[in-house]
Amino acid sequence: MKLLFKILMAACLLANVSVYADEIASSALASIIEKQMDVKPQRIIKTPYLGGLYEVYAGGELFYTDEKGSAYLVGGSLIDGKTMRNVTADQMKALQKQILANLPLQDAIKRVNGNGGGGKRTVITFEDPNCGYCKKLTRELVNLKNATVYTFMVPMLSEDSLVKSRRIWCAPDRLQAWDDWMVHGRAPTGSENCANPLERNSKLAQKLGVNGTPALYFQSGERVPGYMPLDKIEKLLK
């Protein structure tokens, strides 16, 4: 893996690689990847690197292979040897930004603090109601000035997480029910028998590569897994 990484660094040439979600440059390669790697590619593009290296986006991650799927570079970064630009990081940020611009925000709990940031200070979170660090994050987000926060509930931890998520979503005031539990420790007790987006949220989380909570996303395409204090959130919003 280290040798392949060094070869990539030495051989890559400067190029601008466009990012298009759900683009499959080779259906044959997609079938090979799905069989060998047990993941369904959401996007495959042919790059100008190394005589035809393919970039694959699946499960919220990028990796690389050739047209036959004979070898894979997973968990590393593709570095442009001329400019030393991290192609993988740039591509991931651009792709995440595109995906975030088309999120089904109606499936999230919406919080508007102050003037909401005028559309320029938006945070997307994925949270489980029984996640301790999610509760800590919520207490920070309550105090985030002039911003809009969209929270997608993804009950990952237990059956009780699913029950709480349903009750919060079915509450007359979802944000109030969420804060009552996450900030004040007052568990939701109302009905859980209403249509909810929880299954869709889980599929969305999988598509974005969210495998733990909390997870934060910013309009820039920046992705932060785990808890963040308020001051660091502010820095990413500037």
What are these regions (language model features)?
Residues 219, 225-226:
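Short, exposed beta-strand-loop hairpins at the edges of beta-sheets
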Residues 172-179:
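Conserved, helical-rich catalytic subdomain that frames metal- and/or nucleotide-binding sites
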Residues 5-6, 19-166, 180-183, 190-213, ...:
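Extracytoplasmic thiol/disulfide redox context detector
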Residues 59, 219-220:
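Short strand-coil-strand connectors
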Residues 10-19:
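Hydrophobic h-region of N-terminal signal peptides that target proteins for export
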Residues 168-170:
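Conserved NTP-binding/hydrolysis module of P-loop NTPases
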Residues 2-10:
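Sec-dependent signal peptide recognition
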